[in-house]
Amino acid sequence: MKKILILANNDVGLYKFRKELIEELLKDNEVYISLPYGNLVDNLIKMGCKFIDTPVDRRGINPITDLKLLNSYRKLFNKVKPNLAVTYTIKPNIYASLVARFKKTDYAVNITGLGTAFQSDNLLRKLIVFLYKIALKKVKVVFFENEENQNIFINENIVERNRTCKLNGAGVNLEDYPFMEYPDENQNIHFLFIGRIMKEKGIDELLEAAGKIKKEYPTVQFEIVGPMEDNYKGVIDKYVGNGIINYYGFQNDVKPFIEKCHCFILPSYHEGMANTLLESASMGRPLITSNISGCKEAINNNGYLVNVKDSNDLYEQIKRFIELDYKDKVLMSKNSRKHIEEVFDKRKIVKETMKGLGS
């Protein structure tokens, strides 16, 4: 029985999006989980994982804390002696991979998105590219969730193409996100956004577009679900107070919100593969999202693409959807589910991942 060490920076993403993969790995292996303790860790332990509490500072680069993390990973590898390490998120991807490389341990890395650091040509980006080049020198496989991110790593000479594998995101569990009948024709139209309230998710453009739409279509509702960055509190309070949006904060279960909505909106600036789009489409909801890698893959006769950072285009596409015949909205709903079943079925993604890991 092999030992597999999974390293990440939080329990939520690992449990919510990789649960089925972990279940598959547990069939023939001992699975160790290294990340900071969180509310879902106990669920991972109940599945059969062995948990090792490892503090990870998710934001920014601090030489002192990052060296501590590197050292804690070194001790962890000495203790567990894994046959394979699997990493998620940037710091485990770099620092755990560095340890695995020099320990001559097989390791696989997951790039679920490039984040804000890769969006501008600055010193931080150059440092990250440099560290990735060293860390991934001997990697077994690097999994990507979209072709654009894959090509960036290849073109930057971070990793060779034959060591990469593109997956269709983390996939969707079709039973966890079942098709739900489209809302009744007589109901007020509800648009839904789920995500962190931050600039990179396109929240500024959404708020501006929503304000214009509400003037023309007062009965249309905009529902916002997700945790808020501190600098947006005043803005969100203002839009709620003016009756433009309804804000529900973070929700453990977003499915009731998806079921209620007529269309899901995500005007993000960059994504690896937007799980909220896939989950909403799986439940049969049309989509409006950015014409970028990580978002556009979810669209197939089931919604509209918008120009990134373009609030006017977003307004136009929202208006276009409102004016659409009800029967066409229902057809989009069915197309959403069909597309997810054909391309993003979690079972297919897990199978491809296991193949990439050599299992």
Residue locations for each model-derived region?
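A conserved mid-protein helix/loop that constitutes part of the nucleotide-sugar donor-binding site
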Residues: 15-20, 189, 193-212, 312
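Short, structured helix-loop element that forms part of the nucleotide-activated donor/catalytic region
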Residues: 41-46, 151, 212, 221-244, ...
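Donor nucleotide-sugar binding/catalytic pocket of nucleotide-sugar-dependent glycosyltransferases
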Residues: 52-53, 133, 137-179
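Acidic anion/phosphate-binding donor-loop and adjacent secondary structure
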Residues: 61-65, 154-155, 169-188, 256
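Aromatic "clamp/platform" in nucleotide-sugar-dependent glycosyltransferases that forms part
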Residues: 250, 269
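Short hydrophobic beta-strand element within catalytic cores of glycosyltransferases
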Residues: 286-289
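Conserved acidic donor-binding segment of nucleotide-sugar-dependent glycosyltransferases
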Residues: 304-312, 320-326
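A short, well-ordered alpha-helix in the C-terminal region of glycosyltransferases
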Residues: 328-342
